[in-house]
Amino acid sequence: MKIFGTDGVRGKAGVKLTPMFVMRLGIAAGLYFKKHSQTNKILIGKDTRKSGYMVENALVSALTSIGYNVIQIGPMPTPAIAFLTEDMRCDAGIMISASHNPFEDNGIKFFNSYGYKLKEEEEKAIEEIFHDEGLLHSSYKVGESVGSAKRIDDVIGRYIVHLKHSFPKHLNLQSLRIVLDTANGAAYKVAPVVFSELGADVLVINDEPNGCNINEQCGALHPNQLSQEVKKYRADLGFAFDGDADRLVVVDNLGNIVHGDKLLGVLGVYQKSKNALSSQAIVATNMSNLALKEYLKSQDLELKHCAIGDKFVSECMRLNKANFGGEQSGHIIFSDYAKTGDGLVCALQVSALVLESKQVSSVALNPFELYPQNLVNLNVQKKPPLESLKGYSALLKELDQLEIRHLIRYSGTENKLRILLEAKDEKLLESKMQELKEFFEGHLC
């Protein structure tokens, strides 16, 4: 049975993520990390979901039962876990979060000792241990060999210092008015501190988590409130994070939501202008707009494509010796400062770009026009191979003949089919999307 999805393990708390399941997974992961253990320490952080307490305690019980010492640091962004795992010399890091999903869901993401998400072969190795009853039950420690757990509440300072070091030393934010939407999630403490200490005039919204309101009509998936607040406050910029703050949505001074591909393009060129790129390659996923590739080419930069998911972006960056890349959804990686997508690092770089451009953000962040794209997330009841659906191949052939770029795939974390179409003719795009929706609703819903 496959346990891992595209971004760790995710499911409804108490249904898939039961205490017994989490303990078993914790033991399996711990035994895998033990093979290369250097310090016998594992770091655990979480977002603000109520079920995080249950998942955290199950993991602590599992890991200490096989002899690991556990450090618990409470609510922190996912990229903070990646950074602190390496910074605190831990064998591994664990983030308890379902990212942008509703509060009823939760998830578990693993990081190696260098702060990188696990490769697929590493996840498969953990799955094999998970299903090995004999190994699991013979691994418990007794007496002095049992591990210990301790909670450290002040590591947030390390991460704040790290974030501030990512911001250009010759700049400050004193001339910017910024609205932050922390999604009642993991960034609710750290984001206001960082921007305030760098001098910005800050308004914070959705920073009162109660365990059940994470991502609720707020944050990166619902930026309309942020857009209204930016206009009302007459702010220069607005930043919306998702529940675990590895993702960023930007709103300009006019209240417009900045498309993720425009962000990738303008940030890539900004990094080039500072001689901060390690190569001429910038990495994006197969969902990226063709206009991004054309814009980067005009700036003597090459776009490299990869599969969807920030761990695939990270891997492609390493293969191409690139230090910048991301997804149009807002997972953007500056690998000089973060091993995974970091919404706060990205927000600081966007702020620096706007400052140095000496333009309002609605101009500075609008470097090119996009080709029309239509993205639909369709709820499905089953996930058979798409190639097995009668008429599917003929549909794709027709799209190719009409020069409509297409990307159709199941979500790795939800029961959804994602359909992306791109073409120069917007009316044709809408017509074909309706046809596709009706086709898949008839087969999958």
Swiss-Prot record:
Coiled coil: none annotated. One of its GO terms (molecular function) is phosphomannomutase activity. The gene is glmM. Belongs to the phosphohexose mutase family. It holds the Pfam family PGM_PMM_III. It comes from the Bacteria. Catalyzes the conversion of glucosamine-6-phosphate to glucosamine-1-phosphate. This is Phosphoglucosamine mutase. Keywords: Isomerase, Magnesium, Metal-binding, Phosphoprotein. One of its GO terms (cellular component) is cytosol. Activated by phosphorylation. GO terms for biological process: carbohydrate metabolic process; peptidoglycan biosynthetic process; UDP-N-acetylglucosamine biosynthetic process. Binds 1 Mg(2+) ion per subunit. It comes from Helicobacter pylori (strain HPAG1). It catalyses: alpha-D-glucosamine 1-phosphate = D-glucosamine 6-phosphate.
